[in-house]
């Protein structure tokens, strides 16, 4: 797995899915906790303006690249030659887990109906994964009560889906109290896992054009303006 430092943020690029599975297997075996991320261009830009986010992504064990324009930016700045095939979207997370072991997962975030559907679909598609518990994202009990609930469930992996920067702030403040082996934020992934929000066609995913599908699936001029700023990666490439 190749590792790079881009604007003070460490980035990790596995050579293929097999290596990704190996990385997760080692993290699950590790006696220490691993906080990781799947970072896209929009989040990368956000951390440049948010000191807490910046420190968060500097401190994570691995920041896997989820976004074609972030790959293009490091290509231009670091002389690499990555393509859309080198993205590792957080939405595909369960494909990265080792097939030869049972993994317990706790989901925190999203709506109740999405969590219920996500549990059924994930466990059906990935027999080695068990969603052992979940908590919807709009609970007021996100302090010690929630920490105790998560720890009592004894998950191998905790996925926090509250959107950036809320999920990162919550993880930053609570990670030392949690006993999960792997912890990360994953935005709106539960909505996709539930089937209530459609993903792009496979050919668009392979080409790194999933952002374009999402843009038109939930179009707004504000979202369009934001994507246009990210499109050619120029803001990412600035020193």
Q: What label would you give each PLM region?
A:
Residues 70-149, 153:
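Conserved beta-alpha
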Residues 36-38, 64, 157-161, 184:
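Structural motif
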Residues 1-84:
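N-terminal nucleotide/polyanion-binding subdomain common to many enzyme families
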Residues 71-72, 199-239:
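A transmembrane-helix-recognition feature enriched in membrane-embedded lipid enzymes
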Residues 137-141, 180-215:
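Short, flexible loop segments at boundaries between secondary-structure elements
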Residues 150, 154-159, 163-164, 180:
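Proline-aspartate-enriched helix->loop->beta-strand connector
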Residues 40-44, 162-166, 189:
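Short glycine-rich anion-binding loops that position phosphate/pyrophosphate groups of nucleotides
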């Amino acid at each position: 797995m190749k590792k790079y430092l881009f604007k003070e943020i460490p980035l990790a690029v596995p050579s293929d899915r097999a290596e990704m599975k190996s990385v997760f297997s080692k993290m699950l075996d590790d006696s220490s906790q691993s906080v990781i991320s799947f970072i896209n261009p929009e989040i990368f830009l956000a951390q440049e303006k948010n000191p807490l986010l910046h420190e968060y992504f500097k401190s994570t064990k691995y920041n896997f690249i989820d976004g074609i324009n972030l790959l293009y930016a490091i290509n231009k700045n670091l002389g690499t030659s990555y393509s859309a095939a080198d993205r590792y979207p957080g939405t595909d997370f369960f494909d990265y887990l080792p097939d030869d072991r049972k993994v317990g997962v706790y989901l925190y975030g999203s709506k109740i109906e999405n969590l219920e559907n996500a549990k059924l679909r994930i466990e059906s598609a990935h027999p080695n994964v068990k969603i052992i518990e979940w908590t919807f994202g709009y609970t007021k009990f996100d302090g010690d009560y929630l920490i105790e609930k998560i720890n009592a469930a004894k998950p191998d992996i905790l996925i926090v889906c509250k959107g950036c920067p809320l999920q990162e702030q919550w993880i930053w403040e609570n990670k030392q109290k949690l006993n999960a082996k792997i912890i990360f934020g994953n935005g709106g992934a539960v909505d996709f896992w539930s089937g209530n929000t459609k993903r792009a066609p496979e050919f668009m995913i392979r080409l790194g054009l999933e952002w374009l599908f999402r843009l038109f699936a939930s179009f707004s001029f504000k979202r369009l303006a934001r994507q246009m700023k990210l499109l050619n990666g120029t803001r990412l490439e600035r020193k």
